[in-house]
C-alpha cells in the first residue's frame, strides 16, 4: 500500500511540476522580461523561445536553490515516508514553510488578502465575515491562496520592468524615423536602420548580463 501511495504521489508531483515552475517561481518574471526585451529590439525569433526559456529556467533554479535545499534538508532530517497520509500532509506543510515565506514576500498583499478571503468564503459561506482576517493579521496564508497571488504579482512586476526597458528602444525608433523623414527617405522602413542600432547599443552595454543581474538581485535576500 505504501508503494502504491508513493507512486501516485510521485506521478501527481511530476504532472504538476511544470506548472509550478512556470507560475510558482521567478521563472514567470524572467521569461516575460526576456521576451519583451527581444521584441523591443525588433527581433522576432532570435534568441529562440527555447533559448530564452532555458536561460530563464537556469536563472530561476539559481534563485530558488536555497529554498529547494532547505526543503530537501527538512525532509531528509524528518525521514518523511508515504505510509501515513496525515503525517505526510503535516510534514509537507511544515517543509514548505520556506517556500511559503518566499511567496508571501514577493506577492502583493492585496491579492493575497483577496484570494485568502475568497477561499474562506468558499469554505465557510456566509460565515466568512465572522472569520475574516485583516491583511496585517495573515501570518500563514494557504499555499493555494498564495500561488495565484504570487503569479499575478510577478506578471505585473514583469510588465513594469518591460515597460521601462521598452522606452529607450522606442526613442531610438522615433529618432530614426524622424531622420529618415527629414532626409526624404519615406519609402525606407525605419526598422531596417533602427534594429542594427539597437543591437549595437544593447551589445555594447552588455545588456543581457546587466538585465540578468538586475533580475537576480531582486531575490538575493531570500536565503537570509
Swiss-Prot record:
Give the matching InterPro entries: T3SS_IM_P, T3SS_YscR-like
Keywords for this entry?
Answer: Cell membrane, Membrane, Transmembrane, Transmembrane helix, Virulence
Looking at the UniProt entry, the stretches that span the membrane are 8-28, 55-75, 161-181, 185-205
Which GO terms fall under biological process for this protein?
bacterial-type flagellum assembly; bacterial-type flagellum-dependent swarming motility; protein secretion
PROSITE patterns membership: FLIP_1, FLIP_2
Organism superkingdom: Bacteria
Where can this protein be found? Cell membrane
One GO cellular component this record assigns the protein to is:
plasma membrane
Disulfide bonds, paired cysteine numbers: none
Membrane topology term reads: Multi-pass membrane protein
What function is annotated for this protein?
Involved in a secretory pathway responsible for the surface presentation of determinants needed for the entry of Salmonella species into mammalian cells.
PANTHER family in the record: FLAGELLAR BIOSYNTHETIC PROTEIN FLIP (PTHR30587), SURFACE PRESENTATION OF ANTIGENS PROTEIN SPAP (PTHR30587:SF2)
Recorded family membership: Belongs to the FliP/MopC/SpaP family.
State what protein this is by name: Surface presentation of antigens protein SpaP
**Organism encoding this protein:** Salmonella typhimurium (strain LT2 / SGSC1412 / ATCC 700720)
Amino acid at each position: 500500500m505504501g508503494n502504491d501511495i508513493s507512486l501516485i504521489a510521485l506521478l501527481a508531483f511530476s504532472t504538476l511540476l511544470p506548472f509550478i515552475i512556470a507560475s510558482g517561481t521567478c521563472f514567470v518574471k524572467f521569461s516575460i522580461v526576456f521576451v519583451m526585451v527581444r521584441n523591443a529590439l525588433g527581433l522576432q525569433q532570435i534568441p529562440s523561445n527555447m533559448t530564452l526559456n532555458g536561460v530563464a529556467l537556469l536563472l530561476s533554479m539559481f534563485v530558488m536553490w536555497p529554498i529547494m535545499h532547505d526543503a530537501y534538508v527538512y525532509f531528509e532530517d524528518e525521514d518523511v515516508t508515504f505510509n501515513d497520509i496525515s503525517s505526510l500532509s503535516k510534514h509537507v506543510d511544515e517543509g514548505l514553510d520556506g517556500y511559503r515565506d518566499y511567496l508571501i514576500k514577493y506577492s502583493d498583499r492585496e491579492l493575497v488578502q483577496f484570494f485568502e478571503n475568497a477561499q474562506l468564503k468558499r469554505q465557510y459561506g456566509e460565515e466568512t465575515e465572522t472569520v475574516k482576517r485583516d491583511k496585517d493579521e495573515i501570518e500563514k496564508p494557504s499555499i493555494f491562496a498564495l500561488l495565484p497571488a504570487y503569479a499575478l504579482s510577478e506578471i505585473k512586476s514583469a510588465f513594469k520592468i518591460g515597460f521601462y526597458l521598452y522606452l529607450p528602444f522606442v526613442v531610438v525608433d522615433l529618432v530614426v524615423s524622424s531622420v529618415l523623414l527629414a532626409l526624404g527617405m519615406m519609402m525606407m522602413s525605419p526598422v531596417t536602420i533602427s534594429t542594427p542600432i539597437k543591437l549595437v547599443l544593447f551589445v555594447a552595454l552588455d545588456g543581457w548580463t546587466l538585465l540578468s543581474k538586475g533580475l537576480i538581485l531582486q531575490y538575493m535576500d531570500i536565503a537570509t
